[in-house]
UniProtKB/Swiss-Prot annotation:
Its EC number is 2.3.1.129. This is Acyl-[acyl-carrier-protein]--UDP-N-acetylglucosamine O-acyltransferase. The lineage of its organism: Bacteria, Pseudomonadati, Pseudomonadota, Gammaproteobacteria, Pasteurellales. GO terms for molecular function: acyl-[acyl-carrier-protein]-UDP-N-acetylglucosamine O-acyltransferase activity. It comes from Mannheimia succiniciproducens (strain KCTC 0769BP / MBEL55E). One of its GO terms (biological process) is lipid A biosynthetic process. It is an enzyme of class 2 (transferase).
Amino acid sequence: MIHPSAKIHPTAIVEEGAKIGENVIIGPFCLIGADVDIGKGTVLHSHIVVKGITRIGEDNQIYQFASIGEANQDLKYNGEPTKTIIGDRNRIRESVTIHRGTVQGGGVTRIGDDNLFMINSHIAHDCIIKNRCILANNATLAGHVQLDDFVIVGGMSAIHQFVVVGAHVMLGGGSMVSQDVPPYVMAQGNHARPFGVNIEGLKRRGFDKPTLHAIRNVYKLIYRSDKTLDEVLPEIEQVAQKDSSISFFVEFFKRSTRGIIR
């Protein structure tokens, strides 16, 4: 079903069954598969392929040569009807690839709202990207990676399968990340190591001085003491009772399966 207000270039191919919403623009030489649903106000500029069971929300901007919802690269994948779900107001730049999920990984690659994926970035099967994240040029996420809100991944970085990156993390360019990265941390290197709290990013997002002070203290407990994480966790839980932003640390450590960067 194609909304009457949608604008589709004569050279674009929209397969029968696709749902094209109000005021959608589909530019030259795009290919839209039969199981694709594109929401109100989304713009596909040109030469874009959207395939599989793919849902794209409202007011997204998608640039040339992006590939969304294509079959993933997991060797176990055998054409099962898995999905790609994308929220609203995302900017997906040139040559970005976003692959559909796998049955073993939950069946969905899921992206939230207000994200920016720069040129040549790759999002593999079963990834979960929440809101307001940035992938710089050539950043690569392996399968099953999760990015919490406000994560910035520097250019040419790569994140290992199943890694979780906490909210407000900033990863420097060229980082190789093989373990979970706690919230609020800056990290860089091969393999990535922590080098402080993302203070400037937190200030821009309205964190007040007492909260920043509490986050710094927790960072010092984790990274600048001789105690193990199990030993410092009760202390962090006490701080979290007084400051809800610290509860991110507690929740993160309890769900971590790969261990945290050191």
